[in-house]
Amino acid sequence: MDDFVYFSEDPAVEALFCRLLSERCKVDFMGIVEWFLGVHFSWRITSSSVNVHLNQSGFATNLVESFALQERPETPTATPYRSGVPIDSIAPSTDADDSPAQIRRKEAFQSLIGSIGWLSSTTRPDMAAAHSFLSSYTNKPASGHMKAALYVLHYIHSTHDYGISFTSNDVAPMHSYIHYPPSTDAEAYADALPPTTSNSNTLTAYSDACWGSQLGSSVADGTLLPLFKFRSMNGGIVFKNGGPVGWLGKRQE
């Protein structure tokens, strides 16, 4: 059995699709989507707008429980990245590759990083950079890398219902600096114009990079840079209808 989601702006087209599909195979139409591939859809529909919030709270809660962190106090003001403790500055593991401690740590670390990656690529762009850093150490993680990954997991525990939201009548917060704030910003302009459908359906992209090391220190010219260190990070995100539809946070090649 396969699940799928479909949509149409025209009720007649949607009805035709349902009829033709039913004639060809056995199918159950279950109404407005609430769960799909572990993602929860929360809808708020009014006469003037349609709003939806997507999160993976169930997956996040199960992940926290699998590492027995559910009793830890929540700290929703935290971030997934420990300020002042750069992941690249963590001392490498000194355990032999075939030692029991290293094998256990590697298995747990890879499992956790894979789960964090699933969250960060689906509904949690806020964890993309931390996941990118940690992914560099899946081959031989040290205990410090595991602590950093568990710090991200504690952040997930504190923000398990975070996700991404979309609305039918919102506009992107910025199109370019010369048009900021946009003419639809009622807080900025007393004569603000109401957003139109064309405003809402506009793609707006942002990109940035940190120039250099996350260690925060300079090195002399000609210094040989270690692998996975001192490389800039690229970041980018694309918005549509008030929410992100694509993002990345990764090291430059």
Task: Specify the residue positions occupied by each region the protein language model found.
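Conserved beta-strand/loop block within the catalytic cores
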Residues: 5, 40, 174-176
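Short, conserved secondary-structure transition motifs
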Residues: 29-57, 84-89
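Active-site palm subdomain of RNA-directed nucleic acid polymerases
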Residues: 1-16, 24-33, 119-130, 246
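Catalytic palm subdomain of template-directed nucleic-acid polymerases
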Residues: 1-26, 42-55, 136-144
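Generic structural motif
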Residues: 27, 41, 205-207
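Divalent metal-binding acidic/histidine catalytic loops
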Residues: 60-253
